[in-house]
UniProtKB/Swiss-Prot annotation:
Occurs in almost all aerobically respiring organisms and serves to protect cells from the toxic effects of hydrogen peroxide. The lineage of its organism: Eukaryota, Viridiplantae, Streptophyta, Embryophyta, Tracheophyta. This is Catalase-3. GO terms for biological process: hydrogen peroxide catabolic process; response to hydrogen peroxide. The keyword Translocase does not apply. It comes from Glycine max. The active site is at H65, N138. It catalyses: 2 H2O2 = O2 + 2 H2O. Disulfide bonds: none annotated. It is found in: Peroxisome; Glyoxysome.
Length: 492
């Protein structure tokens, strides 16, 4: 299977300059004018084409994850999990699958520093024999909110103020004061790991709960974990200021230079699995994206390794036009009823169609490398050559048939239509356990970051009190420390 199938030939294999249509250009230095100093003529098509193309070079940046870096490599199965899934690319140890990865910051713009305190995106596109599989995650195992209905408001709160275009703590703390479920995510973001040293030295997570299905149709819930073999490293606040002040693209450069030097970064893939019949044994909802699954109860199981051994050839084609979507899965992997995942299934593809056009999956970085066929025709920027006469189904003139049926999770659903919260929220236990697992100096840095955020002059007494109450419910001493620094009295 050729991972570079559908890649257009180079546009620069001519010995001389040409227009986009291939006509030779004998002068690329001067515009066509009336005399040496006269006005430029509109008939200078080369000038018009050159400027028009330049004016349209930029496309809409991603609404989140705008700043990113990509690399290519392979995934190799090291442990047999065929009893859990019928996915072809996981069929046996030794099987290799080409892939491309995009690491990113989340909130800030395309040219922002890579040293800001921000989650990091960790998205992997597997080019399998059964189509692409996009595992679209982050460097933290949890998320801010559990229901995708809140996602647009969440991003608005984290993004800069629409009036001043300045990111401000009072907006963030105001919004999340209504969402105590966010505490677990903030226990990562305001922790030392909130600023990874670079992309090679951070772990990754699928974040959402998916489902694995084996050949017999047996389904289990699954969480995906990427563990870096380089070791997890982070930047403390003063280090981030120093590194960011000297190179705002330090993580991109580190990734590129390491691969170019032959120091290929590697991650081990692990999974946690849970039989849906046993989910009531947990004190939280396993489909709640703000929770981690305890590894002492649901241990990590090794699956394989990912090696990045090739840099991208073109940043625009393989980073800006690279598009991921959690809806893109393969037989043997399926969704769950995770509320955030369910909304991501729609939203990601929708934003790619806005950003890149309806035929974004025809772009070389996004197209499958296996044979594929459907009747999705035409549209803006369609460049697939098709010469068939039958563009409907079914037809006795077209031999293409249905694929072999693949197992999907069997389930029976019942209930009334309603908008409601999940039953087992349990918002405070896991962030408290995480805080208590740290040494005292790490705890103190966490407290200091929260004190700095809550010291924003526009943060009201009410909002400060709410956050102290939340952190007190997670850990009484933590709430007391934050309150003491702010000269407030905890309510719990």
């Amino acid at each position: 299977m050729d991972p570079y199938k559908n890649r257009p030939s180079s546009a620069f294999n001519s010995p001389f300059w040409t227009t986009n249509s291939g006509a030779p250009i004998w002068n690329n230095n001067s515009s066509l004018t009336v005399g040496s100093r006269g006005p430029i003529l509109l008939e200078d098509y080369h000038l018009v084409e050159k400027l028009a193309n330049f004016d349209r070079e930029r496309i809409p940046e991603r609404v989140v994850h705008a700043r990113g870096a990509s690399a290519k490599g392979f995934f190799e199965v090291t442990h047999d999990i065929s009893h859990l899934t019928c996915a072809d690319f996981l069929r046996a140890p030794g099987v290799q699958t080409p892939l491309i990865v995009r690491f990113s910051t989340v909130i800030h713009e395309r040219g922002s520093p890579e040293t800001l305190r921000d989650p990091r995106g960790f998205a992997v596109k597997f080019y399998t024999r059964e189509g692409n599989f996009d595992l679209v995650g982050n460097n933290f195992p949890v998320f801010f909110v559990r229901d995708g209905l809140k996602f647009p408001d969440m991003v608005h709160a984290l993004k800069p103020n629409p009036k001043s275009h300045i990111q401000e703590n009072w907006r963030i703390l105001d919004f999340f004061s209504h969402h105590p479920e966010s505490l677990h995510m903030f226990s990562f973001l305001f922790d030392d790991v909130g600023i990874p040293q670079d992309y090679r030295h951070m772990d990754g997570f699928g974040v959402n709960t998916y489902t694995l299905i084996n050949k017999a149709g047996k389904a289990v819930y699954v969480k995906f974990h990427w563990k870096t073999t380089c070791g997890e490293k982070c930047l403390l606040d003063d280090e981030a200021i120093r590194v960011g002040g000297s190179n705002h693209s330090h993580a991109t450069q580190d990734l590129y230079d390491s691969i170019a030097a032959g120091n290929y970064p590697e991650w081990k893939l692990y999974i946690q699995t849970l039989d849906p019949e046993n989910e009531d044994r947990l004190d939280f909802d396993p489909l709640d994206v703000t929770k981690t699954w305890p590894e002492d109860v649901l241990p990590l199981q090794p699956v394989g390794r990912m090696v990045l051994n090739k840099n991208i050839d073109n940043f625009f084609a393989e980073n800006e036009q690279l598009a991921f979507c959690p809806a893109i899965i393969v037989p043997g992997v399926y969704y769950s009823d995770d509320k955030l995942l369910q909304t991501r299934i729609f939203s990601y593809a929708d934003t790619q169609r806005h950003r890149l056009g309806p035929n974004y999956l025809q772009l070389p970085a996004n197209s499958p490398k296996c044979a594929h066929h459907n009747n999705h025709h035409d549209g803006f920027m369609n460049f697939m050559h098709r010469d068939e006469e039958v563009n409907y189904f079914p037809s006795r003139y077209d031999p293409v048939r249905h694929a072999e049926r693949v197992p999907v999770p069997p389930r029976t659903l019942g209930g009334k239509r309603e908008k409601c919260m999940i039953e087992k929220e349990n918002n405070f236990k896991q962030p408290g356990e995480r805080y208590r697992s740290w040494p005292s100096d790490r705890q103190e840095r966490f407290v200091r970051r929260w004190v700095d955020a809550l010291s924003d002059p526009r943060v009201t007494h009410e909002i400060r009190s709410i956050w102290i109450s939340y952190w007190s419910q997670a850990d009484r001493s933590l709430g007391q420390k934050i309150a003491s620094h702010l000269n407030l009295k905890p309510s719990i």
